[in-house]
Each structure stands twice: as C-alpha cells, then as structure tokens.
C-alpha cells in the first residue's frame, strides 16, 4: 500500500501558491485495509476515506468508464491492482495529474509540470469529454490563473466547444452549474470564466440572458467599449477590485454586476444605441436567470435592486429629498445597511467599467451615504412617544427623515456639485 499527494495541493505547491486542502490517493489497498487502520469511509459512489488524525481525504486509486449521459454516468473500478498512472489519467487537466510520494519526488506521467511552466491548461486525454462539468471547471481555472498568464490550449478549447455542440451541457444539474459559477465569481478574474464560456458556445446555453448582451451597442460617447457584454465584463472586473479585502458579500456584488444591464438585451432595435427603460426591463431576465440556477435570494435581490435603481443613483445630485427617502425605503436600508453599501459598490463599478473611465471618481456614493446617515438619526422611539401609532409611525418617520435629508442636502450639495 502506497499513498501519494495529488491534485491541487501538488499543483499549487509547484506554483508557489498557498496550499489549502490536501488530497491523497492510495495505491494497492482495499477498503477493508483502510477501515482496519482507523480510516472513516465517507464516499458513497467510490471509496473515499478520512484519515483518523488529520481528517484529510484519502481515495483509493480508481479507473472510470463512461456508462451514461452527463457527469454521473460512470462505472468505477477501485481494485488494488489499479496503478497510480491509471488513476491520474482519468483527471481533467495535466496540471492536476501530478503526484508526489512520501519522499517528495514528483510523479508526472502526463507532463503537467511542463504545462505549469508554460502556463497552459491542457486536457489529458479524449476521456475529458466524458464529463461535461469539465467545461465549466476549465473556464474557472482560466479565471483563477489568468493573473499568472495561464491560457487554455487550443486543442482543449476545441474539445470544450465540441462537448457544448453535442448538447452535453444540458445534462448538468443546475446545482452544479451554479456551484461552479459561484466559485468562479470568487476568483480574481471571474470575467475570464464568462469569456471562455462565450468562446466555446456554452454561455448561450447556460446564461442566455448574459449572452443576449453580446453585440448590443451603447452610445460611444459614454461607452467607448460600445458592446454591452464587454461593458458588463469590465464592470465585473471593477467589482472585483472594489470588493477585495472587504467584509462585503463579494459574490453577491459580483453577481449584481453581471446582471445590472441585462435589460439592454431587450431594447427595441429602432432606438439603439440608447436604452431608455432598460432598468425596469432587466428585472425579469434577472428573475428568470436566478430562479433557473437557484441563485441565493440575497444575490437575486441585490441584483434586482441594482438593475432597477443604478441609474437613479448615478443621478443622485438631481434627486429630490422625497425620492431619496423613497429609494431608501424600497431598499430597506434601515434594516439592511450592508445592502446600501454593496449597491453603491456596483454603481461605482458600473461607472468605472468603461474603457478610459477606470479611475473616475464617484462622489454620489459619499453624498448618498451622508444623506443616509442623516436619515438614520431620526429616532423611531421618539416618534412613538409623540403618540403616533401603526401606519402613522411609518408616515411620520418618512416625513421627519425627508425633512432631515432636505436640510442636509442644502448643506452639502454645493460642495459635491462643485467637485
């Protein structure tokens, strides 16, 4: 019985990146042997065990043979005679098929180390096509390692496109699609994930609402990048920069960024490149996308609010105090202050997600935050003590908050408009 460190731990070690989880493969053993050594079996479809002390995962070396559609139709053989090389070849990419023995020696039968040096994501064998989820996984790896100048091998791109064309992606469960997408949103370059999916034809199938933005023009005066899909990817880039090293819900903000302009795909062709009313028009595509992929409610709500109100927020200096309070009420910022801050981040990203506007200031954020903080100072308890009841409490709160915002606006607006 021999154990080898495999997968991401070896790959990231060779890239001088922090190693998060360590996975092991066991060659020449049976489930009974591992159980007798105190390992705990957790794998349902094939034997995976937890080490009695470290709780790290140890899997018996196995081969997989395609037996049906999708990514679950496999027959596994995990008998003791399966070699390390046989186990490694079933993996997706060469860079994920490097093993390390107990002496620190690397076993690299499929030239993964060479591909790491050349910054190439390359599939190991034609068996890659047997698991359509790998199309999304490779797109996600491209997003993760883009900062290290990795690119996908042309033959792997071609195979991903072939898998897509054959309709294999339709076999994926929505849970797995969202799981891969949410992971991609947490990477440093999530826009690469969507661009790769576009390149191989998968975006149209999995994210038709986002794909519909491709080729839809914007006025060049405000959007030198012109294309609505490209603008959305630039906004996503900016959202990443704005949410790094913050306590905000990064994935929710980034999801809102990719959804904020979905309504532009529905703009009547005769009024292009203008997009009057795209804010309201975008609500339904967001709901359709979110419901189909079972996106978390918090993400969906933030995306909808961003879509509907981002243009209002861009014009914050023109809003009447009554409109500002109405906006705050709709966002329920009194109970959800984080939502206010996250919405502001997407609006900043929207402004900067345009070619040549990457460093643009966004004073609307500080202006609205000051109005918000002023409105927060209106004391609910005082309203109740003044004798108001039920609906009267809410009406009086709105009245007092509006007065407070009106006073604050008169005080600070000249300073902001003069910037």
UniProtKB/Swiss-Prot annotation:
The gene is cca. CTP binds at residues 8, 11, 91, 137, 140. Comprises two domains: an N-terminal domain containing the nucleotidyltransferase activity and a C-terminal HD domain associated with both phosphodiesterase and phosphatase activities. Catalyzes the addition and repair of the essential 3'-terminal CCA sequence in tRNAs without using a nucleic acid template. Adds these three nucleotides in the order of C, C, and A to the tRNA nucleotide-73, using CTP and ATP as substrates and producing inorganic pyrophosphate. tRNA 3'-terminal CCA addition is required both for tRNA processing and repair. Also involved in tRNA surveillance by mediating tandem CCA addition to generate a CCACCA at the 3' terminus of unstable tRNAs. While stable tRNAs receive only 3'-terminal CCA, unstable tRNAs are marked with CCACCA and rapidly degraded. Belongs to the tRNA nucleotidyltransferase/poly(A) polymerase family. Bacterial CCA-adding enzyme type 1 subfamily. Residues 228-334 form the HD domain. Magnesium is required for nucleotidyltransferase activity. Nickel for phosphatase activity. It holds the Pfam family HD. It comes from the Bacteria. It catalyses: a tRNA precursor + 2 CTP + ATP = a tRNA with a 3' CCA end + 3 diphosphate; a tRNA with a 3' CCA end + 2 CTP + ATP = a tRNA with a 3' CCACCA end + 3 diphosphate. This is Multifunctional CCA protein. ATP binds at residues 8, 11, 91, 137, 140. Its EC number is 2.7.7.72, 3.1.3.-, 3.1.4.-. It comes from Mannheimia succiniciproducens (strain KCTC 0769BP / MBEL55E). GO terms for biological process: RNA repair; tRNA 3'-terminal CCA addition. Its cofactor is Mg(2+); Ni(2+). SMART domains: HDc. NCBIfam families: PRK10885.1 (NF008137). Mg(2+) binds at residues 21, 23. One of its GO terms (molecular function) is CCA tRNA nucleotidyltransferase activity. Monomer. Can also form homodimers and oligomers. A single active site specifically recognizes both ATP and CTP and is responsible for their addition. Keywords: ATP-binding, Hydrolase, Magnesium, Metal-binding, Multifunctional enzyme, Nickel, Nucleotide-binding, Nucleotidyltransferase, RNA repair, RNA-binding, Transferase, tRNA processing.
